[in-house]
């Protein structure tokens, strides 16, 4: 497995590849959710490149950029064990050669980025589209793999690829859950044992909503009320029912509905969702 630290090294390596290339962009602190993306890429492509880069432009002033876990050696060991061909681990100066005021500014489309996570984390998705587009230019993948857990991010990336006419297939990957049903996240390491038990209200709320939908309930307000009753011990940022353009719904639309939740357990903010 190659560990590539510079753009020059990545470009040289990429030029040597003639068959399909799968790309899994990450911020490191890899878990079984990332592993599932990597394994799918390995299955569907001749070569797989993983990036490990904690992107500063998608963190707000009061967010956890400096505290974000960075177990690089562990991440590299997992990638090698899985059979990844190359891992791109650039420094910030490689990806952002100019100071902030000198950079070309990219903005996520407002109709997808102004609500939900975008409302809670101003500028977050602008930073996401900036780094993802840079990575796409460098890696030039056949396919790129993104988890459905970050649903709003996935929809924005799909829009980016279509809008900018990029010849890249975006492969959405199912949410991976731990044995207790909590959606896997690099931020789960922040939870102590008590907080982890409290956090289980999130998947329980979504499970209750899914059960109601399966029984025929279609009214979004009733579904949200069911979920909020279970989430009452947590600090809920939002529990929303939207279509795939992130427009609020009053009635469930089969195959075009997302139930999205963000809640805080202590200082840790967790996301989860249902694709209906």
UniProtKB/Swiss-Prot annotation:
Q: A Gene Ontology CC term for this entry? A: cytosol
Highest taxon listed in the record's lineage? Bacteria
| One Pfam family matching this protein | Pantoate_ligase
Where along this sequence does the record place binding of (R)-pantoate? Answer: 58, 153
The keyword Transcription is assigned to this record: no
Task: Identify the main location.
Answer: cytoplasm
Write out the entry's keywords from A to Z. ATP-binding, Cytoplasm, Ligase, Nucleotide-binding, Pantothenate biosynthesis
Q: Where is the active site?
A: 34
- Please list the residues that bind ATP: 27-34, 147-150, 176, 184-187
Q: Name one GO biological process term.
A: pantothenate biosynthetic process
User: What pathway, per the record?
Assistant: Cofactor biosynthesis; (R)-pantothenate biosynthesis; (R)-pantothenate from (R)-pantoate and beta-alanine: step 1/1
Binding of beta-alanine, residues? 58
Q: Which GO terms fall under molecular function for this chain's record?
A: ATP binding; pantoate-beta-alanine ligase activity
The record's section on CDD domains has: PanC
Q: Where in the cell is it found?
A: Cytoplasm
Provide the reaction this enzyme catalyses.
Answer: (R)-pantoate + beta-alanine + ATP = (R)-pantothenate + AMP + diphosphate + H(+)
Q: What is its EC number?
A: 6.3.2.1
What Gene3D superfamilies does the entry give? HUPs, Pantoate-beta-alanine ligase, C-terminal domain
Record-linked InterPro entries? Cyt_trans-like (IPR004821), Pantoate_ligase (IPR003721), Pantoate_ligase_C (IPR042176), Rossmann-like_a/b/a_fold (IPR014729)
The record's listing under HAMAP family reads: PanC
Task: Give the similarity note.
Answer: Belongs to the pantothenate synthetase family.
Record's miscellaneous remark: The reaction proceeds by a bi uni uni bi ping pong mechanism.
Q: How does it assemble?
A: Homodimer.
**What PANTHER family has UniProt attached to this entry?**
CYTIDYLATE KINASE/PANTOATE-BETA-ALANINE LIGASE, PANTOATE--BETA-ALANINE LIGASE
User: What protein name applies here?
Assistant: Pantothenate synthetase
Please report the organism this UniProt entry assigns to the protein: Helicobacter pylori (strain ATCC 700392 / 26695)
